[in-house]
Design a protein with these regions (language model features):
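C-terminal beta-sandwich/jelly-roll accessory domains of carbohydrate-active enzymes
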Residues: 667-751
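Active-site neighborhood of glycoside hydrolase catalytic domains
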Residues: 405, 409, 413-415, 425-436, ...
């Protein structure tokens, strides 16, 4: 028999202990959280040339601008046009453009259709986000019968007349949605000597002066007149059947016709925040947001992750490229392309940018934790890290200024701050309440420490209470982290960090680990001896996927119950030490099936459904049952029944109901008989000696290899069904005898 006793309060529990870490990996943003189903929606796609990532020097990580990728043009032709394009090293190259794009940074497609072809109608199609590889030919627009979908596109008629029909069809070309239509007529002379290319030199004239007539043919369609001859068409369509399909835009013209196309959007009309005017740009997929919301995250870290650093100069995440109108956002290839099934087809559209991340934080009631580039490219093994010169004007002016401008964007007064005015004009005049910021991701070494100091000092000169998060590097081992931790503790000891920060710390240090379940269980006592000196811990990326232990990263071995148990054991240690462990977050958060660059993730999804993994269920059990006070826990065992595989934590509230959340993790293959002593945790804290105590017990248990699964089609399966029991004890001094199942996580809630 093992006796578990809940004792006196030890400290205030960190109010930010459980958060989420979002990075656009595994198509977590485009194809996932981004509600728009159109792949390369704006003809601005920039991709990794996957043949170059194994090369060396300047030939490595080359950029491939492919503005028409993921679009098929049948019986019509298309040209990519714009005033700039990405070069092979990511540089912006000026190009000739016969007519203005919607924004100077953007490109568009000029589409020409001749008289009707004998082979059939003219149309263009987009399959959506199917993950590529063997799945590259599959349609990915998820349609549900009788559901409403929003269609939006920007059109500029150039020549001739046509009717454009927009809708989703199945793999056989049969309608999956109703069709919406718009017509245009260009009342002008035929094309001159540019007819061979289909380009006009005077396309930039105002719509009202160009002899253009355009109108929706559907009662629910609407036309909005834009600049430079552009029109915005918005309409709704209705699902006819439930299936995956592809977007089709059919061109019905009795003569040669040319039009420009940009910003094509198709999404579920019931996106997250529908009807809220602040969600006027990027839109979010509701079921994914609701799955994240169910974790009750205290914070949201964004946008990563290694994409913060990028893999080569120019590939770093630049937050200023992600705000403003959608057309103004400068796309970038994702460094995670090399992990994709086809090795390259991963462009960051930035339809979800920093503004959308801040709005999501607000809706989730989670504090924002943006993390910015610190002047050092990704330092992971096998990469080619480049260091920006710390003495350069670019670093001292532009790089540091990015941090200061972001704080103004988030918190500033729109009347006096230009970046705060951008926030206001995007739909959010009120500040977002930013109180912490990450400086680099998984960076380490003397150069990083020097850059961290320069950045944090500039921040604290203006915003002394802003909490700066410092990286401990890639690996969770003391020798690797020593430089960062020594420096952080020195800053805290010399009063050189933040003053009166939100967590009370001078500085936070970000540790990461992707180790084995056994390692995580062994680290439940990791923080017991960490100094309480004003330098707090953020365990910012963790997953018991066995990567650091050299274990194969396979689909079969990912997200097993064994991995979730190891993580649960570790989290009991984080709760017990939440006076120094301020924040934790799992990574990666989201993964598209089959676009998984990492095998193990917290939440998986396909175009239609969500799969909360067993790891998610453990995370949710912990994050939704956390008190504001942590209590001492003792485990008394006999020699014949050792409890070395038992891990316990207890938090609660010192209110009238004296609520306690007691978490017990058994990672062994044997049941454990436990006596839970509640007297020290209840009667000793003022509960009436004669008042009954209500106990609610929830147990998650399964075979170590158990896991949930989801395919490209269909719903998830294999979910662990919680076992729930309720008891009433006659008084707070009573003991509860219970059997803790093997391979289990048990939550006892006492009131």
């Amino acid at each position: 028999m093992v006796r578990i006793s809940v004792g006196s309060p030890t400290h205030h529990t960190s109010g930010r202990l459980y958060g989420v870490f979002f990075e656009d990996i595994n198509h977590g943003a485009d194809g996932g959280l981004n509600a728009n189903m159109v792949n390369n929606y704006s003809f601005d796609g920039v991709y990794l040339d996957h043949h170059t990532w194994r090369m060396a020097g300047a030939e490595r990580w080359r950029t491939q601008a492919d503005s028409l990728r993921f679009w098929d043009f049948i019986n019509c032709s298309a040209a990519s046009l714009g005033s700039e394009i990405r070069g092979i090293h990511g540089q912006r190259v000026t190009t000739d453009c016969p007519a203005p794009p919607i924004h100077a940074h953007s490109r568009y497609a000029r589409i020409t259709s001749d008289v009707p072809s004998e082979t059939g109608p003219a149309y263009l199609e987009n399959l959506g986000y199917n993950g590529g590889g063997d799945n590259g030919g599959e349609p990915a627009f998820s349609i549900v019968a009788d559901h409403t979908y929003s269609v939006s596109l920007a059109v500029r008629p150039v020549h001739g007349r046509a009717e454009l029909s927009v809708g989703v069809v199945d793999r056989y070309g049969l309608p999956l949605t109703s069709i919406t239509r718009l017509s245009y007529i260009v009342d002008s002379d035929p094309l001159d000597d540019t007819e061979e290319t289909g380009l006009r030199q005077d396309d930039g004239a105002d719509a009202q002066d160009s002899g253009v007539s355009i109108s929706p043919d559907s009662s629910d369609g609407a036309i909005v007149i834009g600049r430079d001859g552009w029109y915005r068409f918005n309409a709704d369509v209705t699902g006819l059947n439930t299936d995956y399909g592809k977007l089709r835009i059919t061109i019905d013209a009795g003569e040669r016709t040319t039009f420009d196309l940009d910003l094509v959007q198709f999404m579920d009309a019931d996106y997250w925040g529908a009807g809220d005017p602040k969600w006027r740009y990027g839109k979010l997929r509701r079921d994914l947001v609701e799955t994240i919301q169910a974790l009750h995250p205290a914070f949201l870290r964004f946008p990563g992750g290694c994409i913060v650093e990028g893999v080569t100069p120019g590939n770093e995440y630049r937050w200023k490229d992600t705000v403003g109108s959608l057309a103004a956002r400068r796309q970038q290839y994702s460094m995670w392309s090399f992990k994709m099934p086809d090795g390259s087809s991963y462009s960051q559209s930035y339809q979800i940018g920093f503004y959308e991340y801040f709005c999501l934080c607000e809706d989730l009631k989670a504090k924002p934790l943006p993390t910015l580039f610190a002047g050092i490219a990704c330092q992971s093994p096998g990469r080619d890290p480049r260091h920006m010169d710390i003495n350069s004007a670019t670093f001292r002016s532009n790089m540091i200024q990015d941090y200061l401008d972001l704080i103004e964007f988030a918190n500033g007064d729109p009347e006096s701050s230009s970046w705060a005015a951008v926030r206001r004009d995007m739909g959010h005049p009120e500040p977002f309440g930013l109180d912490m910021i990450g400086v680099g991701n998984e960076n380490f070494g003397a150069d990083y420490v020097a850059k961290f100091d320069m950045i944090s000092e500039a921040i604290h000169e203006r915003y002394p209470d802003m909490l700066c998060v410092m990286s401990a590097g890639l690996f969770p081992f003391q020798p690797a982290m020593k430089r960062s931790w020594d420096h952080a503790r020195t800053l805290a000891a010399t009063d050189s960090g933040a003053h009166d920060s939100a967590t009370g710390d001078a500085i936070i240090v970000d540790e990461h680990s992707y180790h084995s379940p056994e390692w995580f269980a062994s680290q439940a006592s990791r923080f017991d001896a960490y100094p309480r000196c004003g330098a707090g811990v953020y365990f910012g990326e963790y997953s018991a996927n066995g990567y650091f232990a050299g274990q194969p990263q396979t689909e079969q071995g990912a997200n097993t119950w064994k991995s979730a148990l190891g993580e649960a054991a570790f989290l009991t240690g984080c709760e017990r030490n939440s006076d120094v462990v301020r924040m934790t977050s799992y990574a990666p958060l989201l993964a598209h099936i089959p676009a998984k660059g990492w095998a193990q993730n917290l939440i998986e999804f396909n175009p239609a459904h969500v799969n909360p993994t067993v790891n998610y269920e453990v995370e949710r059990l912990f994050s939704t049952h956390l008190g504001d006070t942590t209590y001492a826990v003792s485990i008394e065992q006999t020699a014949s029944r050792p409890a070395k595989h038992l891990y316990v934590s207890a938090t609660g509230h010192d209110r009238d109901d004296a609520c306690r959340y007691i978490k017990i993790v058994n990672i062994s293959d044997s049941p454990v008989d436990v006596t839970l002593e509640i007297a020290r945790g209840l009667a000793g804290l003022g509960a009436s000696p004669s008042r009954p105590v209500r106990l609610e017990v929830t147990t998650l248990s399964a075979n170590p290899t158990a896991k949930t699964t989801i395919g490209y089609r269909g719903e998830a399966s294999g979910a662990i069904v919680p076992e729930r029991r309720a008891y009433t004890l006659p008084s707070p001094s009573s003991l509860l005898a219970m059997k803790i199942k093997p391979y289990s996580v048990t939550l006892v809630v006492s009131r």
